[in-house]
Amino acid sequence: VVERLRANGKRVDIISKTHVASNRAGGITADHWVRRHVINGASSCDCLWVDEISQLDVGLWLQLSKLTYTGMQFLLSGDFNQFSPKGNSFRGSMIPENAFETSGLLHTLAGGNRLELVECRRSDAELFGFYSSLITGGSRFELASLMQFAPPRSC
């Protein structure tokens, strides 16, 4: 997607919360980008790809929300069933884990669009099935069959 946007003459910036994720995507950390382009300057990109969106804390989303009226396009990716931000609070009040996932800001930034990928293409299908079953709140596997993967315990 980024290659296509750039081929069409769009300037695309890529951010993520962690160094590892931002480096893997070819970008920089969200904290650095926000300090440089929102707090201490102005962004000149046409499209901002925010990866691992569930890891960004409310402080970063407050800063990014300032860009909603600039005409900037947002490409948002992540999995809300993974890590949530640590210590995510606003004025001393903890933010519920699903607050951003169900927010109007997410809907606005995404332009009302949502694409949910449900087919595994990068790992073992059986493991993916097991992980996916945990997300929905119950394992479809019997406990005895899972115990074969547990390391032996010494008493």
Tell where the protein language model's regions lie, with residue ranges.
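Conserved ATP-binding/catalytic motifs of P-loop helicase motor domains
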Residues: 1-155
